[in-house]
Every structure is written in C-alpha cells, then in structure tokens.
Amino acid sequence: FTTKSSLRYLLIVLDLDGTLTNSKKEITPKTKAALMKIQEEGKIVVLASGRPTPGILHLADELELQKYGGYILSYNGAKIINCKTKEIVYNKTLPQESIQVLYDKAKEFGIGILSYSESEIILGNGQDQYNELEAKINRLPVKEVENFPEYIDFPVNKCLMTGEPEKILKAQEKLRELFGEKLNI
C-alpha cells in the first residue's frame, strides 16, 4: 500500500488525441501549465501517438520538450526521438518490398493509401475525406503522386489505409492473413 504523496513518477507518457489535446486538437492552458510544472521539477514528458513525427512537432515545441529532454513516440511506437538531442532512439521501418503489396491491396479493396515524408503526407490513390482529415490533424500538406510504390524510395515507418469502415475491415482481415506477424496491421 502506498499513499499518493509517496509516489515518485519520473516519466509521464501521454496519448495526444482525446487525452493531451481537447476536441479542437489543442492543449488547454491548464494542462499546459501542469505539464510545464512537472518538467520544471525534472520529470520527463513523452508524447505518444499514431501520428507521424512531423504531426507532433508543434505540440512538442509548445511544451518545450527540447528544453526539458522530452521524447516523441510516433507512428504507433515505430519511431522514438529525444527532443533535446534530436537523436532517433528507436526506428522501425516497413520492409521496402511491402510498399508495392500494400498499394496493390489498397487498389484492390478500393481504399486510399498514404505515407509520410519529413514534411508532407504522400497520397497513393486519390483524396478522400479520411486523408483530408489526416492532413488537417497533422497540419501537413498533401502531395498526390502517380506511382506511390516508386515514389516511396526512402524508409517509412507507416502506411495508412483510408476509406469506409466496412472496406477497411475487409482489407484488414486479408492483410493480416497475408502478412501475419511481419507487419502490424
């Protein structure tokens, strides 16, 4: 048994959407003040999200994570960055050969596919309401490319498929069968 006053936390990990941020995707003044206070006390703040790293940077800047040595855990944990040193602490990327397969399957199921560079969202097969929302939430411009697999010639941490829920669920089931444990679907 322990009392509240005897607990010693050294690190706080926060999900972004609906936890750290409100419905407007903003950090409230009260939350910001509390997080600044704990950082001043030497605690470390980690921002954790499925968002891409560039989509989290503005929140990290607002909380001054670079000053206090906080971290960004992005792409559902596939990349971890020390904000103070800019060191990439962990980086798991998709196998390059999986990009073509994912693109082909997205086309087969009639759903969108996107990935991320350091500065933009890259669309593989057209705009839809879901990838428009992804761009808005992450505050990133969108670049639509003709040949998605060919364009993605650099390491990526995540591809996201977008579309109507029924189609996504069907694709998810088939992709899990296809990739097994090789990819997190």
Regions found by a protein language model. Name each.
Residues 8-25, 47, 102:
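Asp-based phosphoryl-transfer active-site loop
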Residues 105, 109-185:
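Conserved acidic, metal-coordinating active-site core of Asp-based
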Residues 26, 54-55, 166-167:
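Short alpha-helical
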Residues 24, 95, 164-165:
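Short beta->alpha junction loops/turns
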Residues 29-130:
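Active-site phosphate-binding/coordination module
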Residues 2-4, 64-65, 151-153:
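Solvent-exposed alpha-helices and their adjacent loops that cap or buttress functional pockets
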